[in-house]
């Protein structure tokens, strides 16, 4: 394929488009098809930067003219195949060309949809570059015209490939500068909004059938929520809805990976811990209403629920226990939330509940007890702290069935076992409560203890 062949065919095709002259349409389409096949071979030369720019400068003006759309699509496919080898300075020109096409588009058809697909493929094929703000502006234009949930799979695939190529972490030992630049866009971050919207379209209930593109996208989410700048980004959000969305996303994503490294864990724990310390004191305000009778702090419940779910999932890692050791204010706040929910929200029992009834702060107590279980396991230090902060009595009080907190009884019994293990003070604390008939003997039996009276004193002993 010679330069003359490329230039001649591009010139003829553009001339036909600009003059709406399609008498040689079949010939031009065949010639473009030949070029497209040849362009797949990386050993062949690409079109010149000037010719690529000429193609991208053109915008169809008649969306009823099928010949025009097919011919222009052929030129764009040529650009798509050349994209990996093109000067990255052409990236903003592609984005601008795509924007012009979207603005001019006044009706859709099979061929306009195919052109849109090719445009996304061009963007996806470009080398990684630093035009983050250009990409963000383009995503804003896209959102003004389309809803992500309505995008066909054929378009979603190159969108995901584009996001992954531009923002994934290539080397965990080197700062991801592209993602850093993206996370510096605190306001009107259209790319981050798109990432969240795409996340909502993945069916996590059927993990065995998550396709390659979605798996790649999930790995990008790992990079985003563990990036060193994500904490600052999420803390700078003015809309509580955005924070709630990303907490919800993270509560799902942390369940899809079991090999978090310490750097990733510290990043996750840091921004979740920071948000928890912000929202925990507001739990009392969650009962307040505005003058219109609307809940002014409704987000607090959603956020605390998500954060405790994230902590519960990450508690299995030693780094989480170390994090709680280092940030000493976190455990008291956790037990404060535990106590507030225990005191203010009635358990839902089989007798009291309606079918499928769900109360407020659903599963939060179970999540907190799970966290306390991991912290107290083989740790005298945490056993003591939890008792001193009132956590042991709360765990004892929740060895019950509560439909608002599935499996809370089972989790509380496990936690109680860890709290009593090799801890005489905790055992005596429980014995004193048992003497007052506060503790169910059956619960003690289930954790392997029994009550004895020795020299007139009640004690708890291993069975």
UniProtKB/Swiss-Prot annotation:
Recorded GO CC terms: cytosol
SUPFAM superfamilies: ARM repeat
Keyword NADP: no
UniProt-listed GO biological process terms: cell division
A Pfam match: Atx10homo_assoc
Compartments in which it is found: Cytoplasm
Family according to the record: Belongs to the ataxin-10 family.
Protein task: May play a role in the regulation of cytokinesis.
PANTHER family recorded: ATAXIN-10
Stated name of the protein: Ataxin-10 homolog
Lineage: Eukaryota, Fungi, Dikarya, Ascomycota, Saccharomycotina
């Amino acid at each position: 394929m010679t330069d003359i062949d490329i230039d001649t065919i591009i010139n003829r095709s553009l001339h036909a488009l600009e003059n709406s002259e399609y008498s040689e349409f079949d010939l031009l389409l065949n010639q473009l098809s030949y070029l497209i096949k040849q362009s797949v071979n990386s050993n062949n030369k690409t079109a010149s930067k000037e010719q690529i720019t000429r193609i991208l400068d053109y915008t169809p003006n008649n969306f009823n003219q099928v010949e025009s759309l097919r011919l222009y699509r052929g030129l764009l496919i040529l650009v798509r195949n050349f994209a990996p080898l093109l000067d990255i300075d052409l990236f903003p020109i592609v984005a601008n060309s795509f924007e012009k096409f979207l603005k001019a588009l006044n009706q859709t058809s099979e061929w306009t949809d195919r052109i849109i697909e090719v445009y996304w493929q061009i963007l996806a094929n470009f080398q990684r570059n630093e035009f983050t703000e250009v990409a963000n502006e383009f995503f804003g234009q896209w959102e003004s015209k389309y809803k992500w949930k309505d995008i066909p799979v054929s378009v979603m695939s190159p969108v995901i490939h584009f996001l992954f190529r531009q923002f994934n972490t290539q080397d965990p030992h080197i700062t991801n500068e592209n993602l850093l630049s993206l996370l510096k866009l605190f306001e009107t971050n259209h790319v981050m909004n798109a990432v969240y919207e795409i996340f909502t379209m993945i069916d996590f209930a059927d993990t065995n059938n998550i396709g390659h593109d979605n798996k790649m996208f999930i790995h990008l989410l790992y990079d985003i929520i563990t990036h060193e700048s994500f904490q600052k980004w999420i803390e700078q959000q003015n809309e509580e809805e955005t924070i709630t969305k990303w907490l919800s996303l993270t509560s799902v994503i942390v369940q899809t990976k079991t090999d978090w490294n310490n750097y990733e864990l510290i990043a996750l724990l840091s921004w979740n811990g920071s948000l928890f310390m912000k929202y925990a004191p507001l739990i009392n305000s969650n009962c307040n209403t505005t003058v219109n009778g609307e809940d002014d702090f409704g987000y607090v419940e959603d956020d605390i629920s998500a954060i405790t779910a994230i902590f519960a999932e990450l508690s299995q890692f030693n780094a989480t226990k170390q994090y709680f050791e280092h940030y000493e204010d976190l455990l008291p706040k956790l037990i404060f939330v535990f106590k507030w929910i225990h005191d203010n929200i009635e358990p839902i029992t089989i007798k009291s509940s309606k079918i499928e009834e769900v109360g407020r702060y659903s599963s939060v107590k179970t999540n907190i007890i799970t966290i306390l279980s991991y912290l107290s396991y083989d740790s005298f230090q945490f056993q003591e702290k939890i008792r001193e902060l009132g956590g042991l009595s709360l765990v004892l009080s929740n060895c019950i069935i509560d439909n608002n907190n599935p499996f809370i009884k089972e989790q509380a019994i496990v936690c109680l076992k860890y709290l009593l293990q090799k801890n005489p003070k905790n055992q005596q604390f429980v014995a004193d409560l048992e003497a007052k008939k506060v503790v169910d003997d059956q619960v003690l039996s289930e954790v392997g203890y029994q009550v004895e009276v020795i020299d007139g004193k009640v004690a708890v002993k291993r069975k």
